[in-house]
Amino acid sequence: MAMMEYLTTRKDELIGWVRKFSIFPYPFVTACCGMEFMAVASTLYDTDRFGAALPRFTPRQSDLLMVVGTITHKEAPVIKRVYDQMCDPKWVMAFGACATSGGVYRNYTVLQGVDRIIPVDIYIPGCPPRPEMVIDAIMKLQDKIAGERHPIFPYEKQNPVPV
């Protein structure tokens, strides 16, 4: 008679493991960091092995908003609307010096960091950042996703208050 084997794990660990290898990015590319973003998407760096290869072209199908480049005050409502259209759970990556702090375009028309309008989960510094830094950021985001608590029901609270 064959011995039956069972794998036991916690619900959060299983869902975290599945989600961390199925990241669907939505690139919001506005400036010169877009050239380096295209290099990251090439076969030389192969982001598919991290589960983040296929960019989505609608925010409703994505869970990672990659803000690449300069964000002006006129673009701020657009990026806020894109963020609001994304389904939960969602994460935001600020790609480059312009997205994180305004960069070299520090004047009255440029938003001094995308974190002033939407919450940012991970920052990638540099002008432009190297593809290796982007891969490292994806790996750190995967660790963050794997460590999160994943409620099955939408009304289940993250930190329940004892009665």
Swiss-Prot record:
GO terms for biological process: aerobic respiration; electron transport coupled proton transport. [4Fe-4S] cluster binds at C32, C33, C98, C127. Its main location: membrane. It comes from the Bacteria. One of its GO terms (molecular function) is NADH:ubiquinone reductase (non-electrogenic) activity. Keywords: 4Fe-4S, Cell inner membrane, Cell membrane, Iron, Iron-sulfur, Membrane, Metal-binding, NAD, Quinone, Translocase, Transport, Ubiquinone. Its EC number is 7.1.1.-. The keyword Cell inner membrane applies. It is a peripheral membrane protein. GO terms for cellular component: plasma membrane; respiratory chain complex I. Binds 1 [4Fe-4S] cluster. It is found in: Cell inner membrane. The keyword Iron applies. Its cofactor is [4Fe-4S] cluster. PROSITE patterns: COMPLEX1_20K (PS01150). It catalyses: a quinone + NADH + 5 H(+)(in) = a quinol + NAD(+) + 4 H(+)(out). NCBIfam families: nuoB_fam (TIGR01957), PRK06411.1 (NF005012). NDH-1 is composed of 14 different subunits. Subunits NuoB, C, D, E, F, and G constitute the peripheral sector of the complex. NDH-1 shuttles electrons from NADH, via FMN and iron-sulfur (Fe-S) centers, to quinones in the respiratory chain. Couples the redox reaction to proton translocation (for every two electrons transferred, four hydrogen ions are translocated across the cytoplasmic membrane), and thus conserves the redox energy in a proton gradient. Belongs to the complex I 20 kDa subunit family. This is NADH-quinone oxidoreductase subunit B. The gene is nuoB1.
